[in-house]
Amino acid sequence: MFSMKKLLILLLAWTFAWSFTLPALARPLLVAAASDLGYCIDELVAAYRKTAPDAEPKVSLGASGNFFAQIRNGAPFEVFLSADMDYPRQLIKLGAADSTAPAPYAIGRIALWSLDPAIDPARGLAALVADERVKRFAIANPVTAPYGRAAKAALERDGVWDKVQAKLVVGENIAQTAQFVQTGNAQVGIVSFASLHSTKLKGSGRHALVSNNGLPPIEQGAIVTRAGAGNPHAAGFVRFLGSPTARAILARNGFGLPAGAAE
């Protein structure tokens, strides 16, 4: 019969052995990501988890402006991947971020896209706005979506912002803007070039990049929020976005890359 002392030793040995075989509990990481990342965020998360197996990023997609408002008002997102640099900078100024500066991770591009075989996006903004076959013209919300601001700036640059008003269909974010074209609710849309690299949309219809002459770049920045200050994976994920692995994923999905991003 085992004595109490021997039984205690056995229990301690069993517990010690299992401590080396049980997997570490995954630590959640709440990420707010701009909608233009929707087609590659799963690939980015999977690649990050290879470097940090105990991380479990939970991603919400939406308009950068909406996430800005939510984080400013205390939403518990730990990382914010914005489609611009301005919203992260504002959160830093408001004291709602742990980062001291946004980390640039991608440069977005906008493209004209149509599924109508009779409509050629290569004709350009002015011609498409004037085309009577184009009854609805989709852009993202210029107030809350950086890609919407870029679309408005391009239309203003080409002198057709006022003319397009009667045809405008405004998406809450850039993903919804693409859906308007995809479902036939708009004959033409200004969408993110990255979205056209997705498995779902690649090869659908015709598209043409919108010239960036005279337009500011759509530089996209990431920050660790105040809520993420105590989670090492928040800073780890932001650093990962500057790694060769992440940059290759972003480039493959139609994004430009900022110079000087560090691993």
Where are these regions (language model features)?
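N-terminal secretory signal peptides that target proteins for export/translocation
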Residues: 1-5
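Bacterial N-terminal signal peptides
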Residues: 6-23
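Active-site phosphate-binding/coordination module
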Residues: 100
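Exported/periplasmic ABC-transporter solute-binding proteins
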Residues: 26-52, 56-61, 65, 69-73, ...
